[in-house]
């Protein structure tokens, strides 16, 4: 279950990645900030991150570090023990802990959380967007699901006021667990097309879990 939580939220970060923003004298609205990120998504980006998972009581369960690549509708995210990929059609991931390779066709509902492009392009119909009280240095935008889904119930994303770049993503889950992702660095980068090709043969001895 923990792995599912990490995958669901970490890949959501792809929608924040393209915001390699420049300083502006006028703060954009929450919706225009999202629209700008959607437009920049297809250019490709690389993000490094660290994250902490907390249980419903607030106790920290685990920490992770990883990297996420995006290009258009595609993304690749790697963090121990997961290597996950979406090639625009199929979503797959390898779990090094149990040596399983899972592949599926995600539904539009799945993609609203998993796929950055779909999340942004459908955010108005899938989420209610509201700006919360921020700090002197950051703005906080809340995304609340219009329709109940199995895992994530809401997301809060912090943006630096000076650059409009995302700095933190907090995911709240139905069971009260909370995942906090801190963005370490953002780089504008065009990944190779090979980055978004993932096959079971790359993981010798793995067990196939085909959910297609």
Q: At which residue positions do the language-model features occur?
A:
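Solvent-exposed strand-loop boundary residues in beta-sheet-rich modules
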Residues: 57, 97-99, 175
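Beta-turn initiation residues at beta-strand->coil junctions
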Residues: 53, 78-79, 96, 170-173
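An acidic-aromatic
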Residues: 67-114, 179
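Positively charged n-region of N-terminal signal peptides that target proteins for export
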Residues: 1-2
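Bacterial N-terminal signal peptides
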Residues: 7-18
């Amino acid at each position: 279950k923990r792995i599912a939580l990490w995958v669901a939220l970490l890949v959501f970060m792809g929608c924040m990645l393209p915001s390699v923003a420049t300083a502006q004298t006028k703060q954009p609205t929450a919706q225009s900030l999202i629209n700008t990120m959607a437009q920049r998504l297809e250019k490709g980006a690389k993000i490094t991150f660290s994250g902490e998972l907390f249980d419903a009581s607030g106790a920290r369960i685990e920490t992770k570090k990883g990297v996420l690549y995006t290009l258009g509708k595609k993304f690749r995210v790697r963090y121990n023990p997961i290597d996950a990929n979406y090639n625009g059609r199929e979503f797959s991931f390898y779990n090094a802990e149990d040596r399983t390779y899972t592949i599926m066709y995600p539904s539009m509902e799945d993609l609203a959380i998993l796929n950055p492009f779909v999340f942004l392009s459908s955010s108005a119909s899938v989420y209610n967007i509201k700006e919360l009280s921020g700090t002197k240095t950051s703005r906080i935008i809340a995304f609340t699901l219009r329709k109940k889904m199995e895992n994530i119930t809401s997301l809060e994303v912090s943006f630096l006021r000076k650059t409009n770049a995302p700095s933190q993503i907090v995911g709240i889950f139905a069971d009260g667990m909370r995942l906090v992702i801190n963005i370490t660095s953002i780089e504008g980068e065009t990944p190779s097309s090979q980055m978004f090709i993932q096959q079971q043969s790359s993981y010798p001895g793995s067990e196939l879990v085909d959910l297609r």
